[in-house]
Amino acid sequence: MVPEAPAPFEEPLPPEATDQWQDRALCAQTDPEAFFPEKGGSTREAKKICMGCEVRHECLEYALAHDERFGIWGGLSERERRRLKRGII
C-alpha cells in the first residue's frame, strides 16, 4: 500500500473573487418592486439606482445572456434591452 501524498496547500481566494456580482448590486438593498413595476408604472427610480451601481454592466450582460424579459436590468427596460440586442440602441 502506497501512502497518500499530502494535499497541496491552496491559498484562499480573495473575497472579491468569490463574490457574486449580485451580492454587490445596489438593487439587492432596495425594494424589488421598483425594478419590476406594474405595466405602465414608472421605471425612473430603478434606473436612477442602476446608474450609480458598480455592477451595472455585469447585470446588463447577465440579462442579455439569459434573455431576461421582465424588469429593469443594468439600467434598461425590457424594450430597451430588445432594441439593444437588435442593434437599434
Swiss-Prot record:
Keywords from the UniProt entry: 4Fe-4S, Chaperone, Cytoplasm, Disulfide bond, DNA-binding, Iron, Iron-sulfur, Metal-binding, Phosphoprotein, Transcription, Transcription regulation
Cofactor: [4Fe-4S] cluster
Subcellular location: Cytoplasm
Domain 4Fe-4S Wbl-type: 26-83
Residue(s) carrying Phosphoserine: S42
Major location (coarse): cytoplasm
Cofactor binding note: Binds 1 [4Fe-4S] cluster per subunit. Contains 1 [2Fe-2S] cluster after reconstitution of overexpressed protein from E.coli. Following nitrosylation of the [4Fe-4S] cluster binds 1 [4Fe-8(NO)] cluster per subunit.
Result of changing C50A: Retains chaperone activity
PROSITE patterns: 4FE4S_WBL (PS51674)
Amino-acid positions noted as binding [4Fe-4S] cluster in the UniProt annotation, renumbered to this chain: C27, C50, C53, C59
GO cellular component terms, A-Z: cytoplasm
InterPro entries per record: 4FE4S_WBL (IPR034768), Whib (IPR003482)
S-S bridge residues: none
Pfam family membership, one: Whib
Pro residues bias: start-end ranges: 1-15
Modification after translation (UniProt): May be phosphorylated, possibly on Ser-42. The cluster is degraded quickly in the presence of air. Upon cluster removal intramolecular disulfide bonds are formed.
Record annotation: effect of changing C53A: Retains chaperone activity
Function: Acts as a transcriptional regulator. Probably redox-responsive. The apo- but not holo-form probably binds DNA. The apo-form functions as a chaperone, preventing aggregation or helping in correct refolding of a number of substrates; this activity does not require ATP or the ability to bind a Fe-S cluster. Chaperone activity is insensitive to the redox state of its cysteine residues. The apo-form has no protein disulfide reductase activity. The apo-form binds to its own promoter.
Record-stated family: Belongs to the WhiB family.
PANTHER family xrefs: TRANSCRIPTIONAL REGULATOR WHIB, TRANSCRIPTIONAL REGULATOR WHID-RELATED
Name of the featured protein: Transcriptional regulator WhiB2
Native source organism of the sequence: Mycobacterium tuberculosis (strain ATCC 25618 / H37Rv)
Gene: whiB2
